[in-house]
Amino acid sequence: MGRRAPDRLDRGVTTTSPRTQAPPQAGRGVHATARIRATSHDGVTVLPLLRSDGPFHLRQLRNHGSQARVCVVSAMSAPLGGDRLAIDVSVEAGAQLEITTAAATLALRGATTDHATYDVTLTVGEQATLYWLPQPLISTRGSNLRQTYTVDLAPTARLILREELILGRAHEPPGDLSSHLTVHRDGRPLLAQHTTFGSTAPGWDGPAVLGEHRATGQILIVDPAFANAPPATRLLGDEPANGEGIVAPLAGPAVLATALAPTATPLRHLLDDAVRPRTPCST
């Protein structure tokens, strides 16, 4: 995540305890899980659990009213090949939480040919709200990342989830990238989506998928209020060469905005036009 460090000598240090773990063996990656738990206390959201680990340094920002805010700051280059990274977030009944990242996440090659994994688990309770608003994920040449989102929502929970994928840095091809999003609401499936790019997905850059575009993203909004007033379907973008997208209701109180564009900037503009969540990481 964030800027690439000159080396990884800092790997194996956990930010929440004084212990220092042994450095990883050659050819193996880092195994780390950061955890966040938000609860409501007298109408204000507090964070009884905020545990950093590995490359994830969790920084608590000033509350926005009753809403707690956390920014994930990169403590080292990650994910690299062989890494097994995870973030586990639980927003309990009545709590409100916004999570952002300080910079884009770079999927990098690393010292091993093994793939990296990045697993995000989001659990949102009754009358609770979660904004998951990270900066883009950039798949760089030679990288191999498998990313998963597993989301479990209570019937009255609200969620805004943003994902932006950038396929390759300027003038270079991407690595291999797969992203799997699974959302359950009240124990029932709401959305299951699996996208794959790179050498393992023939045709990903053909006219039926991305064509000449190298940036794709989506915003998922789940809100019980949509049960009575679902948003209308509408198209995004006036010029296909500069990017295009669609906002469409799902079979549930949810709406999904998806877009693709040549680069990160027009992609962000398209998604911002679809819905406008709060912007990240300002104190």
UniProtKB/Swiss-Prot annotation:
Ranges of Polar residues composition bias in the record: 13-23
Keywords attached to this entry: Chaperone, Cytoplasm, Nickel insertion
InterPro entries tied to this protein: UreD (IPR002669)
Location in or out of the cell: Cytoplasm
Biased composition (Basic and acidic residues): 1-11
Assembly with partners or alone: UreD, UreF and UreG form a complex that acts as a GTP-hydrolysis-dependent molecular chaperone, activating the urease apoprotein by helping to assemble the nickel containing metallocenter of UreC. The UreE protein probably delivers the nickel.
GO cellular component term, pick one: cytoplasm
Region annotation Disordered: where it falls in the sequence: 1-30
Function: Required for maturation of urease via the functional incorporation of the urease nickel metallocenter.
Pfam family, any one: UreD
Species whose genome carries this gene: Saccharopolyspora erythraea (strain ATCC 11635 / DSM 40517 / JCM 4748 / NBRC 13426 / NCIMB 8594 / NRRL 2338)
Main location as per UniProt: cytoplasm
Protein name: Urease accessory protein UreD 2
HAMAP family: UreD
Example of a GO MF term: nickel cation binding
Family to which the UniProt record says this protein belongs: Belongs to the UreD family.
